[in-house]
Amino acid sequence: MEQAPADQGPQREPYNEWALELLEELKSEAVRHFPRIWLHSLGQHIYETYGDTWVGVEAIIRILQQLLFIHFRIGCQHSRIGIIRQRRARNGSSRS
């Protein structure tokens, strides 16, 4: 009968420590790009929905990741990541 191999990898930090560190990084990045009132309202919504649980932590991590990804993809003024906006000719002569 087959058995799973023994865990031979490096010791990983506990999930809750990793999640809290990730949340802190996301929060510090989010306050540089979004109004604090928006972030406070988001935090209140998560707290009212999930309470003080790990499910709430996971939800806010997921939402902040999505918000930051979309923000950068659209073209954040603070970042070089995003869509490159090209000036278009008014008469369309730049098309081949």
From Swiss-Prot:
Biological processes annotated in GO: DNA-templated transcription; monoatomic ion transmembrane transport; protein homooligomerization; regulation of DNA-templated transcription; symbiont entry into host cell; symbiont-mediated activation of host apoptosis; symbiont-mediated arrest of host cell cycle during G2/M transition; viral penetration into host nucleus
Pfam family, one: VPR
Coiled coil start-end: none
Compartment(s) where it occurs, according to its Swiss-Prot or TrEMBL record: Virion; Host nucleus; Host extracellular space
Gene Ontology cellular component annotations, sorted alphabetically: host cell; host cell nucleus; host extracellular space; virion component
Location of region: Homooligomerization: 1-42
Domain of life: Viruses
Post-translational modifications: Phosphorylated on several residues by host. These phosphorylations regulate VPR activity for the nuclear import of the HIV-1 pre-integration complex.
UniProt cross-references to InterPro entries, sorted A to Z: RetroV_VpR/X
Keyword terms, alphabetized: Activator, AIDS, Apoptosis, Cell cycle, Host G2/M cell cycle arrest by virus, Host nucleus, Host-virus interaction, Ion channel, Ion transport, Modulation of host cell cycle by virus, Phosphoprotein, Transcription, Transcription regulation, Transport, Viral penetration into host nucleus, Virion, Virus entry into host cell
Family matches, as HAMAP family: HIV_VPR (MF_04080)
Protein family (similarity comment): Belongs to the HIV-1 VPR protein family.
More info: HIV-1 lineages are divided in three main groups, M (for Major), O (for Outlier), and N (for New, or Non-M, Non-O). The vast majority of strains found worldwide belong to the group M. Group O seems to be endemic to and largely confined to Cameroon and neighboring countries in West Central Africa, where these viruses represent a small minority of HIV-1 strains. The group N is represented by a limited number of isolates from Cameroonian persons. The group M is further subdivided in 9 clades or subtypes (A to D, F to H, J and K).
Function: During virus replication, may deplete host UNG protein, and incude G2-M cell cycle arrest. Acts by targeting specific host proteins for degradation by the 26S proteasome, through association with the cellular CUL4A-DDB1 E3 ligase complex by direct interaction with host VPRPB/DCAF-1. Cell cycle arrest reportedly occurs within hours of infection and is not blocked by antiviral agents, suggesting that it is initiated by the VPR carried into the virion. Additionally, VPR induces apoptosis in a cell cycle dependent manner suggesting that these two effects are mechanistically linked. During virus entry, plays a role in the transport of the viral pre-integration (PIC) complex to the host nucleus. This function is crucial for viral infection of non-dividing macrophages. May act directly at the nuclear pore complex, by binding nucleoporins phenylalanine-glycine (FG)-repeat regions.
Subunit structure of this chain's protein: Homooligomer, may form homodimer. Interacts with p6-gag region of the Pr55 Gag precursor protein through a (Leu-X-X)4 motif near the C-terminus of the P6gag protein. Interacts with host UNG. May interact with host RAD23A/HHR23A. Interacts with host VPRBP/DCAF1, leading to hijack the CUL4A-RBX1-DDB1-DCAF1/VPRBP complex, mediating ubiquitination of host proteins such as TERT and ZGPAT and arrest of the cell cycle in G2 phase.
Name of protein: Protein Vpr
Higher taxonomy: Viruses, Riboviria, Pararnavirae, Artverviricota, Revtraviricetes
Gene: vpr
